[in-house]
């Protein structure tokens, strides 16, 4: 039994959910998201809850059961509350600026990095903290990982771009011979 898959998802007020041909459609205001289950699981809407059930009893069906339930829950959370990731920039001369759909990064290279944000994602910069917001958990995480990948934190001084809650394991530098 999938412990995640058997939990129903409560549909919040203001969110319209419909199921057509194994495709879940979520709508709230101008947000419209779809989740195609590709026929791997049975989906029903009962008493204001989305209920998932596996198609068969094999291992693959049970895996899809929990996966699609988690994906649907992330969509509901995304269109109601949204997702955020925060990145912190450490280093002399390292800066960031949000200019519309472009995130401009100065990370010690000879050139500026102009990162174009995908649709549905917005970024804001407050001193040395970059906040990435969006309604799709996967896209927000992907953008944060790509921005961090431009200059990952190094273990000696901790310079670079890191997640705000991330802890960098520091190394001792060279010691002189006596």
UniProtKB/Swiss-Prot annotation:
Example GO molecular function: rRNA binding
SUPFAM superfamilies: Ribosomal protein L6
Transmembrane portions of the chain: none
UniProt record, GO biological process: cytoplasmic translation
Keyword terms: Ribonucleoprotein, Ribosomal protein, RNA-binding, rRNA-binding
GO cellular component, one term: cytosolic large ribosomal subunit
Disulfide bonding pattern of the chain: none
Pfam families: Ribosomal_L6
Keyword RNA-binding included in the entry's annotation: yes
Family note: Belongs to the universal ribosomal protein uL6 family.
Summary of the function given for this chain in its UniProt record: This protein binds to the 23S rRNA, and is important in its secondary structure. It is located near the subunit interface in the base of the L7/L12 stalk, and near the tRNA binding site of the peptidyltransferase center.
Subunit structure: Part of the 50S ribosomal subunit.
HAMAP family per the UniProt record, alphabetical: Ribosomal_uL6_B
Name by which UniProt lists this protein: Large ribosomal subunit protein uL6
Species lineage: Bacteria, Pseudomonadati, Campylobacterota, Epsilonproteobacteria, Campylobacterales
Gene name in the database record: rplF
